[in-house]
Amino acid sequence: SLAQLDHGSAARAGLVMSRAARAIERAVGAERVYCLSFCEVDRQLHFHLFPRSRRLLEAYEAATATTGEPVNGPLLFEWARTTFTGGRALPDGFPSVADTCLRIRRALAATAAVGQGDDVP
């Protein structure tokens, strides 16, 4: 559990998540990066960093007839998790998973190169 981390580990976890969220935002143009931690299936503490781009929001709103309503992040996450699971293709125009991973790696490397990741293990 997050509550069981000592202060140093909690601080490092926050820095790692901040750096990762920044890289995800840059790599995929996310307007938000949702941070989720359930630890239900795998009881070990871990986090899901889920990018919410404008295009993903529009796809969600079109599929759920919620255009113009306040965004419900947990419902959007669940919709995406169940819609794009099991190898189902992303909508046209979305980058591939491999391309997205490459972009995130490059963004992480760029932040480390300019000293924004020096304090993160």
Residue ranges and their predicted role:
Residues S1-P121:
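HIT superfamily nucleotide-processing domains
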